[in-house]
């Protein structure tokens, strides 16, 4: 028979373990979960996720501060796309990388909460741009060493759901990452370019000859990873390369405060701005 104090300590540890495995609180707002349709998130938070607003760059979906940016040229491109046109034909990104979506992506990607793959992919499917079409869907690959460490490729899990929805084959082994690169997160745009140069290769170029490719990734930051993949595919003889990402980082000097608060439902102070 365990003493009462020992029993209480054991029960407390069991509750902590259970909360880690099966959280009873929303990972975004901390409110108790009940029968919410999305794992780890309450319905109220999930429903605050809003698509990226117009106006955006006609090539890479970079948000513009003002609608005046496209007043005279509807197909206006951002400075980066004008100065150094990307190798992809068009990149669509569907949502701003802000809470609660940011919380969901981080939990999915870095904490292994794989049950979020389906609802995140469904967000992408629900917001697919009109006219999107391709012959093959390809996820941005991880280097084998990083794949072994993480045990899954988040981009492949998203691409698999998209391929099913679009009735298109998903090629997960043709575009491969051959170089171990430093994490892109803390690097500048130029450092990212240097970091990823010659990082990818194509195993079977004939399988992709002339085919339109849809690259899929989770987050668009500067676009250097997608662009290096697109460059590799084009050099191997593919047709047009398009890119689709679930979310993109938004810079506070490019996106008005109003947009940030509208798309999160939270005051700026809670966003750390």
Predicted regions: what they are:
Residues 1-216, 221-273:
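Glycine-rich phosphate/pyrophosphate-handling loop used in enzymes and phosphotransfer proteins
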């Amino acid at each position: 028979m365990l003493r009462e104090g020992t029993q209480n300590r054991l029960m407390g540890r069991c509750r902590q373990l259970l909360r880690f495995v099966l959280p009873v609180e929303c990972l975004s707002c901390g409110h108790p979960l009940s029968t919410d349709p999305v794992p780890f998130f309450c319905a109220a938070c999930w429903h605050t996720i809003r698509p990226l607003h117009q106006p955006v760059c006609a090539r890479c979906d970079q948000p513009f501060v003002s609608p005046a940016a496209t007043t005279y040229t509807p197909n206006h491109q951002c400075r980066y796309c004008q100065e150094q046109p990307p190798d992809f034909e068009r990149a669509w990104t569907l949502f701003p990388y802000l809470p609660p979506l940011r919380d969901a992506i981080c939990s999915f990607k870095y904490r292994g909460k794989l049950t979020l793959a389906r609802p995140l992919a469904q967000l992408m499917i629900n917001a697919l741009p009109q006219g999107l079409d391709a012959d093959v869907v390809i996820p941005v690959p991880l280097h084998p060493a990083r794949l072994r460490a993480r045990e899954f490729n988040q981009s492949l899990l998203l691409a698999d759901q998209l391929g099913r929805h679009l009735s298109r084959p998903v090629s997960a082994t043709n575009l491969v990452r051959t170089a171990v690169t430093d994490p892109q997160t803390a690097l500048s745009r130029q450092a990212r370019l240097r970091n990823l140069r010659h990082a990818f290769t194509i195993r079977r170029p004939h399988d992709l000859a002339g085919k339109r490719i849809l690259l899929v990734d989770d987050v668009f930051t500067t676009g250097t990873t997608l662009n290096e993949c697109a460059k590799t595919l084009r050099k191997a003889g593919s047709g047009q390369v398009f890119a689709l990402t679930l979310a993109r980082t938004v810079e506070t000097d490019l996106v008005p405060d109003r947009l940030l608060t509208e798309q999160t439902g939270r005051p700026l102070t809670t966003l750390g701005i």
